[in-house]
From Swiss-Prot:
SUPFAM superfamilies on file: Thiamin phosphate synthase
Gene name linked to the record: thiE
Family: Belongs to the thiamine-phosphate synthase family.
Residues binding 2-[(2R,5Z)-2-carboxy-4-methylthiazol-5(2H)-ylidene]ethyl phosphate: 131-133, 163
The protein, known as: Thiamine-phosphate synthase
Known pathway: Cofactor biosynthesis; thiamine diphosphate biosynthesis; thiamine phosphate from 4-amino-2-methyl-5-diphosphomethylpyrimidine and 4-methyl-5-(2-phosphoethyl)-thiazole: step 1/1
Catalytic activity, as annotated: 2-[(2R,5Z)-2-carboxy-4-methylthiazol-5(2H)-ylidene]ethyl phosphate + 4-amino-2-methyl-5-(diphosphooxymethyl)pyrimidine + 2 H(+) = thiamine phosphate + CO2 + diphosphate; 2-(2-carboxy-4-methylthiazol-5-yl)ethyl phosphate + 4-amino-2-methyl-5-(diphosphooxymethyl)pyrimidine + 2 H(+) = thiamine phosphate + CO2 + diphosphate; 4-methyl-5-(2-phosphooxyethyl)-thiazole + 4-amino-2-methyl-5-(diphosphooxymethyl)pyrimidine + H(+) = thiamine phosphate + diphosphate
Residue positions binding 4-amino-2-methyl-5-(diphosphooxymethyl)pyrimidine: 34-38, 66, 105, 134
Amino acid sequence: MTFLPLKSPLKFYAVVPTADWVERMVEAGADTVQLRCKALHGDELKREIARCVAACQGSHTQLFINDHWREAIEAGAYGVHLGQEDMDTADLAAIAAAGLRLGLSTHSVAELDRALSVHPSYIASGAIFPTTTKQMPTAPQGLDKLREYVKQAGGTPVVAIGGIDLNNARAVLATGVSSLAAVRAVTKAANPEAVVKAFQALWDG
């Protein structure tokens, strides 16, 4: 099983909770956005995902849907992002057959090995620094471990996530990761659009 490669580098990767936020990120020119929506179910969730897909059409923003792979396939989303536990329950073959890209979360060498075995479009590694966004199963990985994960991943793009902000972004990029993901650095910012542009400028300088 192999998943399609990314059409373009992920670069700055905003993780947001609603379609409203996805629309804002597209308007701000974000390279990549993930809908991580835990509050909606059923038809409401389907409508939310459909809004996200519509918002990204005609833009360069790559859209990933967290967890909800069936709805993502139905809506024609660009990709799906799954956690380690989701690998046991999601129909990975169906996701691949539908032509969706796949990203997988990893928190250790063993999880990275497992993720790489299904040839995903990218892997996410974290949490790099302490984070209050979600309860993490492992201690923060730190930059030295992240550097090793990048080597282990070989040609598979690595997204760093967890406690990343504009103060530490350059140090994280220096490990060789191809993308920086941010949650609170965007959603809690006074001016999220300016934060997006500041992150994306890291790849231009």
